[in-house]
């Protein structure tokens, strides 16, 4: 018979690092070409004029200018779009 209580095992105790997603440059901000505007998983925001989309759905500026947000109706729902105004 044990005189000490054995330690139990648990399936918890892990946590992933934060991915630092979100808007990095807000509307009206000046950005240079190549600047990251939004880090996202999936396409919550669509790329508009002078905005490119990376393979991980990150939106970045193709040209220097000012960030602008608007919404467009697409497939019976409103989608958010990011543009760079020169």
From Swiss-Prot:
Domain of life: Bacteria
Gene Ontology terms: cellular component: cytosolic large ribosomal subunit
BP GO annotations: translation
Signal peptide bounds: none
GO molecular function, one term: structural constituent of ribosome
SUPFAM superfamilies documented for this protein: Ribosomal L27 protein-like
Ribosomal protein in keyword set: yes
Entries under InterPro entries matching the protein: Ribosomal_bL27, Ribosomal_bL27_CS
UniProt keywords, alphabetically: Ribonucleoprotein, Ribosomal protein
Pfam families according to UniProt: Ribosomal_L27
Annotated spans, Disordered: 1-23
UniProt family annotation: Belongs to the bacterial ribosomal protein bL27 family.
UniProt-recorded name of the protein: Large ribosomal subunit protein bL27
Originating organism: Prochlorococcus marinus (strain MIT 9515)
Taxonomic classification: Bacteria, Bacillati, Cyanobacteriota, Cyanophyceae, Synechococcales
Gene: rpmA
